[in-house]
Amino acid sequence: MNRRLILTFALLALAITSAGAGMGNPVVGGKQMYPTKNIIENAVHSADHTTLVAALKAAGLVETLEGPGPFTVFAPTNGAFDKLPTGTVDTLLKPENKAALTKVLTYHVVSGRISTSDLLKKIKQSNGSAELTTVEGGKLWVTLHDGKHIMLKDEKGGTALVTIANVFQSNGVIHVIDTVVMPN
């Protein structure tokens, strides 16, 4: 009887621990994202963000995004970069285009840790369209698409949907987006 009771409690404890392991941050690019790691430490493990990581390295922004922040990063997937006109990514990755690449990448970053609930509050307070100032200095507008998905609008009129939200990091938060947003 005692042995059976111990086994039951052990199995219950294992079930609770296993259930808790899956809670919290989502899986991005096939890998679990950890809130104890910084933006770069998590991003390098996402199979969906290899182009973004290569671009951050080419622009010299890795050290910045490993820093204390906090930062909110709207992180385009590889598929988002694939939507750009042919040759755009290769051109931006050339050393002579580092300034242009940095401008595009820092346009995807906002100072502070802005969660989905924060974005929704801003949208509501702004009558449906909230304005964010990026680290690059430009503006992004945040709205609700179909009443349930957060959508970004860039200075050129392009839009991106947040596909995975609230990927919390030790130095901020990542929101995965399906399109690269572009500054003026």
What is the predicted function of each stretch?
Residues 20-184:
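Mature, structured domains of secreted/extracytosolic soluble proteins
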Residues 8-17:
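Bacterial N-terminal signal peptides
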Residues 1-7:
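Bacterial N-terminal signal peptides that target proteins for export
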